Amino acid sequence: MGAALATDVHQHLWPAELVDRLRARRRAPYLDGWTLHTRGEAPYDIDPAHHDVARRIEADQQDGVGLACVSLSAPLGIENLVRPEAGALIAAWHEGARALPDHFAAWASVPMVDPDLDELAALLRDGFVGVQLPATDLASPAAWERAAEVLRVAEEAGKPVFVHPGPEVVRPLAGTVPDWWAPVVGYVSQMQAAWWGWHAVHGRALFPRLRVLFGAGAGLAPVHHERHSARGGETPTIDPGVYVDTSSYGPQALDALVRVLGVDVLALGSDRPYAAPLGRLLGDAATYAIRVANPQRLLHEDRIETGEGRTWPRAS
């Protein structure tokens, strides 16, 4: 018997409906052929093969991935456009995502201005695995409170919320930076702010049944828990309903996360096509947990054991 197939909770694939809408635009975000233009990052040449459905399925199968959860690319800033523009692009995303083969599942998205809560509830009933929100819209305790209505819809539907890096802020005085700057500097700081915003607002008390996934290992924010405690923060308990994914990190970073959070809340998320799914992680048992068991629990287990008295271990 072969190894159990993995679930990758974090991939991106642009369906034709979304590509057509982006090409029809003349201001950011837009596509000129296959060159992507956004407000906060340099123009980026997209490889069309990265968004070819058949090639993606083949690549996933080679990596032992049986289900890929795809989401709208939040760094484009679509969710924060004026409402009619955001609505049209997000509708194109949902239309294209629905038509993908069964190898894929999809995260829903919402405009951050005047989100249609009834439509979101319908999408979550209609098979979308959860809702993705940009980290830039969850970057403080107050920001989490502003998103409360959307979070409540997900909680009532028994579906998780995926916190994903959002658009980079335009900084005219920053000068020229390398292409890796936004993913390594900007996105990481976004994820850290969202992580600490959730804890500072006491998110679990507000949303007792909500499952939350932080992309990119939450920017390794959990590894900073000792600094958080040293500077006056309360020592958080380990929350089995708050997950982090593995995207763009390797054994050293993931080992550090496991030392702090344990293995049960680390889920395979590759960010494909920008990185490949990790294969073997920290031994056989951990590999199975991260690639198979944890993603399935994130997506489907609508019950959270609060773990009274369990505090974050000291990394050593």
Annotated model-derived regions:
Residues 126-261, 265-267, 313-315:
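Catalytic pocket-lining loop regions of alpha/beta-barrel enzymes
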Residues 46-51, 78-80, 110-118, 138-145, ...:
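Acidic-and-aromatic substrate-binding clefts and catalytic sites of carbohydrate-active enzymes
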Residues 57-66, 90-103, 120-127, 150-157, ...:
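Acidic (Asp/Glu)-rich catalytic clusters
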Residues 2-9, 15-67, 95-96, 210, ...:
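Mid-to-C-terminal alpha-helical segments outside catalytic/metal-binding sites
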